[in-house]
């Protein structure tokens, strides 16, 4: 079963919000990370449309996908987003396949974390954020999450993230999954798990490799 989400309309909500659109078009391209402007607009648009009380992101990194959520929360005038990232090279490298693991092992995680916190302060959105500097497997996810963005490890840990978030979403809550075609198929197994537990796939961006699931 597939229920369509009109992503173009959702992105337009973000474009129509002058402050949010300006931040995404000017700030996002300057940040470390891989979130596209299209995905950033979608995340912000979902927040603007759904008016969530609670959002959660696994794999906050430099904030390239987290900040659009915060900008939209600020525009809404309330809500909170939890960002989870250990900022630890050992943890990051352990969650990847050879080749990728070497890259993560040499990355200056401290510098990325420093940049992220500087962005929170510079954009005046820290009050909407709760940052948890831990492995996602060590975090007890709260209940009644409205919007979740899962973009941490994409191997077995990524599947476990999806598995653990499944019962924590509110009814009609939305899960955005990144790198769905990652080597090893862990995220695809996560999609199957969500489908088996009452979620529907509402949108899939094949070119950019992410999708949107919604709890029925």
Locate the predicted segments by residue.
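S-adenosylmethionine/decaboxylated-SAM
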Residues: 29, 41-216
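Class I SAM-dependent methyltransferase Rossmann-like catalytic core
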Residues: 14-50
């Amino acid at each position: 079963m597939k229920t369509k989400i009109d992503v173009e309309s959702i992105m337009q909500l973000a474009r129509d919000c002058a402050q949010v659109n300006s931040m995404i078009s000017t700030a996002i391209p300057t940040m470390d990370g891989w979130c596209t402007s299209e995905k950033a607009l979608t995340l912000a648009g979902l927040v603007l449309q759904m008016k969530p009380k609670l959002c959660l992101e696994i794999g906050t990194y430099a904030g390239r996908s987290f900040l659009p959520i915060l900008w939209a929360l600020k525009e809404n005038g309330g809500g909170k987003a939890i960002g989870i990232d250990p900022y630890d090279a050992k943890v990051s490298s352990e969650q990847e396949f050879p080749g990728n693991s070497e890259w993560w092992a040499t990355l200056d995680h401290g510098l990325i974390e420093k940049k992220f916190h500087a962005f929170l302060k510079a954009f005046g959105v820290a009050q909407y954020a709760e940052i948890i500097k831990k492995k996602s497997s060590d975090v007890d996810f709260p209940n009644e999450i409205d919007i979740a963005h899962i973009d941490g490890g994409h191997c077995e840990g990524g599947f476990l993230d999806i598995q653990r978030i499944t019962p924590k979403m509110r009814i009609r809550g939305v899960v955005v999954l990144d790198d769905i075609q990652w080597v090893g198929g862990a995220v695809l197994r996560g999609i199957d798990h969500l489908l088996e537990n009452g979620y529907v796939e509402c949108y899939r961006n094949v070119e950019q490799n992410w999708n949107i699931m919604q709890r029925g």
